[in-house]
């Protein structure tokens, strides 16, 4: 057995549910989340990287997930031609006014907008950290966050306010050495 295999097994046994939930938040689809997690694991463990601890391996896989989501979105996907295939366009006004849950609303964003929103409000990263993480300019990240916030506010209702001063992190600070 290769040196990395026990660590991969430990990541899958202990950390997979958390990583899968994170991938599902970014993809909006449980099946695609499984594929994204698998791709992120392959990227993380196939390049001969040496991880000293399961926390380090999990952090690397977690960091790879948004990149995998964006890369997968670049692949060809058929574009529906029938307006009925666009529920956000073809739905009657009463349906559009119904409250949507956050996961459904996130699906309406582009992959990059979704990644920026999740990294900002779920992972509590700063704009510059998101830019470094995704390989984008700070201004580009700000634009994605602005566009996505406006879209989410429209989808979730007028009383949703994603301005910085009105948000709180959804994750508690981790104790040193734990992740």
Question: Predicted regions: what is each one?
Answer:
Residues 1-21, 31:
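A short, charge-rich alpha-helical start-of-domain segment used by transcription regulators
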Residues 6, 10, 78-79, 83-107:
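Acidic, proline/glycine-rich intrinsically disordered inter-domain spacer in sigma factors
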Residues 19, 23, 33-44, 130, ...:
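Short, small-hydrophobic-rich alpha-helical interface motif
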Residues 29, 110, 126, 135-140:
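Helix-turn-helix DNA-binding motif, specifically the short coil turn and the N-cap/start of the second
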Residues 35-42, 46, 55-67:
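Structural recognition of an alpha-helix C-terminal capping motif at a helix-to-coil junction
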Residues 46, 52, 63-84, 95:
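Arg/Lys-rich amphipathic alpha helix in sigma70-family domain 2
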Residues 66, 70, 134-162, 170:
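DNA-recognition helix of helix-turn-helix
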